[in-house]
Amino acid sequence: MSQKMMYEFKRKLEELEKYKGRGTELITLYIPPDKNIADVSNQLRSELSQASNIKSKQTRTNVLAGIEAILNRLKHFRKPPENGMVIISGVVNINGKEKHITEIIEPPEPVPLYKYHCDSKFYLDPLKEMLTEKKLYGLIVLDRREATVGLLKGKRIEVLDWDTSMVPGKHRQGGQSSVRFERLREIAIHEFYKKVGEMASEALLPYKDKLIGILIGGPSPTKEEFYEGEYLHHELQKKVLGLFDVGYTDESGLYELVEKAKDVLQEVDIIREKNLMQRFLKEVARDGLAAYGEEEVRRYIELGAVDTLLLSEDLRYERVKYRCPKCGKEVEVTVREGIEKPPFCEEDNVEMEEVERRDIVLELSELAESTGAKVEFLSTESEEGEMLYKAFGGIAAILRFKPDGGQ
């Protein structure tokens, strides 16, 4: 699924999550790709019969209307779409007004279950599960003093376990022969490696089917001894992607490991976002091919000067088009999501009417794509994504050229 599709899907779920209904009036119907449409229609007719017995007149009327609306939509399908579909229907409150909505959602992944659900809100949990980051890497950093095990989930690093060793230092205590001391030290190292292997198994085996790979970091020869000694469970051992030199073996070591492994993790979003922002900041620092802020970036897009558009997934603004009902004059303004402040037409002194309202991230991305520009979406879960959002207003661009006489 592309970044843009993922963003659109996420925004749709956010919109549906806001809707509330009375009692159990909101219907959510999950239809898997292999479900027979005729069987679904038959069950809905049965639900229609049962809904006729609902005591509350208003609830009964709204539930019956919702089921009828879904049945009407199903008439247009001989079979479910490739990934199945989810149909939502019911009377919701939108800006203080009640409105009956019916929508069909074709999710990015196969619908996992058949379910007919009535509640005061739409049942979205299986759809939200599809938004969870699928790229998962195991992280292990160790030396002979301590070890930390963690996960890289898309952009986030999570510590799963940490422990210290009982391995003595290299200098023996008085009264011990050097040979005996070295033997005891080797036994302690071996026991610690076993302990780290068990710690990794306990922390990472539950994720083994989802793990893309495992990265091991630490000083030499510790990480090599640990890996080559096969202290890891065989299911984890075969997933090791590489060994990397790191100076820290606590939580900060996990971050250092991800940085050192960036060639291996080139496609992981945390590295992708870091590289994009470094490229952008380099241009900003030398007053080069960079632009930020909606107005400036929009101007460069329209001039065909944008090479890569950087957008924050957390922007919640809309581009609204208004038209004067008398003279037909049109204006476009950007407002915070949900804000309704129609401007006045100065010539006719009347309030303008809303014609169109679009999510600004989608509007700008489509405008940029129409000029051949690349579009990159950054979340605020990474430091770089947060910088884009807070320092540059969530909208920035790397330019092909500066049409106004710059570089």
Curated annotation (Swiss-Prot):
Protein name: Peptide chain release factor subunit 1
One term under GO cellular component: cytoplasm
Predominant place of localization: cytoplasm
GO MF term list: translation release factor activity, codon specific
Subunit structure: Heterodimer of two subunits, one of which binds GTP.
Keywords associated with the record: Cytoplasm, Protein biosynthesis
Pfam families: eRF1_1, eRF1_2, eRF1_3
UniProt xrefs under SMART domains: eRF1_1 (SM01194)
Role according to the record: Directs the termination of nascent peptide synthesis (translation) in response to the termination codons UAA, UAG and UGA.
Family the UniProt entry places it in: Belongs to the eukaryotic release factor 1 family.
Compartments it resides in: Cytoplasm
